[in-house]
A protein has these predicted regions:
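N-terminal glycine/serine-rich phosphate-binding loop of ATP-dependent small-molecule kinases
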Residues: 1-77, 182-185, 276-279, 294-306
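Glycine-rich phosphate-binding/hydrolytic loop that grips phosphoryl groups
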Residues: 189-197, 242-245, 250, 260, ...
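Gly/Ser/Thr-rich active-site cleft segment
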Residues: 96-190
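Active-site phosphate-binding/coordination module
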Residues: 55-108
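Conserved phosphate-binding catalytic cores of ATP/NTP-utilizing and phosphoryl-transfer enzymes
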Residues: 1, 113, 176-204, 315-320
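Phosphate/ATP-binding catalytic cores across multiple sugar-kinase/actin-like superfamilies
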Residues: 50-52, 190-193, 257-281, 315-319, ...
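Short glycine-aspartate micro-motif
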Residues: 3-7, 57-62, 79, 123, ...
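A short helix-loop
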Residues: 97, 111-119, 132-137, 163-168, ...
Length: 325
């Protein structure tokens, strides 16, 4: 079966077909400053649309926490990125329990919407927007839906809103067709990258070192704690400590400047998660700053290994085999 795997990352859009990987830069922002970060949604869609050829199935992983608003089926905003923090000085008119899988923070879409002045009747994640443009159906997997702040992952209920929300799926399935290709529910890029890095049966910590960094642990069922209880695959929880020092900051500093900061940052994160015996560090940063990371992890006293090669595309390939939900 001819499959196309597309990963919409923060820096690049990558795709894989018949074993060959390609990439193109993610579009530059139209708005970047004063806490705002917007990208032309049409430009993103045109890139994705242009990738689909005579494929039979298309699988997506997408950056999370961003959104596009629609009115009468047409976009009325740019893509408001996860980098956008317009909600920073906004008092939320809602509360979120741990069951929503996300905390209230400046880039939370649900909070960001309180600042919007445009008229809209439908909300899309980036993943559901791309699927909507391809199939006419606004739908996505819960790993992409939950970061918006509208979905209770534990009860599998959604908020009642005056506007339409994406149809959330707790399994990965075909949503509709674009030409001859079946379009599958998009999944969160963090979850896809971790699946690709450690496989479906891994138990332990995962230090995901991309543009942003997270420390995660995969546990069965729904788990509460001092972390975001993000949905994962097969009904598992991706216990996630967010907003750690990642590639965006590390690229701008020397090892000497960063060492103590990373020890403190990652050490605090480890204390928030249930105790585990091993850690896998993965992501693009591993290739470039391994010596620094070894020093930090040695200091923290964890049993660790590195995985430089696997990414979200590898996770999507596992998804395509039907081995996980």
């Amino acid at each position: 079966m001819k499959d196309l795997f597309i990963d919409i990352g923060s820096t690049n859009i990558k795709w894989k077909r018949e074993g060959v990987v390609h990439q193109t830069p993610f579009p530059a922002p139209l708005v970047d400053g004063n806490g705002l970060y917007e990208v032309n949604a049409e430009e993103i869609f045109k890139i994705v649309q242009g990738l689909i050829e005579d494929d039979e199935r298309v699988f997506f992983s997408v950056q999370m926490h961003g959104y596009v608003l629609l009115k009468d089926g047409a976009p009325v905003t740019n893509y408001v990125s996860w980098r956008d923090e317009r909600g920073v000085n906004t008092t939320p008119n809602f509360t979120l329990s741990k069951e929503y899988g996300v905390d209230i923070k400046p880039n939370l879409p649900r909070l960001s919407l309180q600042t919007q002045t445009v008229e809209y009747d439908e909300f899309c994640t980036l993943g559901s927007y791309l699927v909507y443009r391809l199939t006419g159906i606004n739908a996505t997997h819960i790993t992409d839906a939950a970061p918006s702040g509208f979905y209770n992952v534990f009860t599998k209920e959604r908020e009642k809103t005056a506007f339409k929300l994406p149809i959330e799926s707790y399994t990965i399935k075909a949503i509709g067709r674009y030409g001859n290709a079946e379009i599958y529910t998009p999944v969160g890029d963090q979850q896809a990258a971790i699946l690709g890095a450690v496989g479906k049966d891994f138990q332990g910590y995962v230090l995901n070192l991309g543009t942003a960094a997270q420390l995660c642990e995969i546990l069965d069922g729904f788990v509460y704690g001092e972390f975001e209880s993000r949905p994962y695959f097969d009904g598992k929880t991706l216990c996630t400590v967010t907003r750690l020092i990642g590639g965006g900051v590390i690229a701008e500093h020397t090892d000497e400047e960063l060492y103590e900061r990373l020890v403190e940052d990652y050490g605090k994160a480890l204390k928030k998660l249930p105790v585990s015996s091993r850690l896998v560090a993965t992501g693009g940063l591993v290739k470039y700053r391994k010596e620094l990371l070894c020093k930090v992890l040695d200091r923290l006293g964890v049993n660790y290994s590195f995985n430089e090669n696997c990414d979200a595309l590898a996770g999507l390939e596992i998804v395509s085999k039907g081995e996980i939900k």
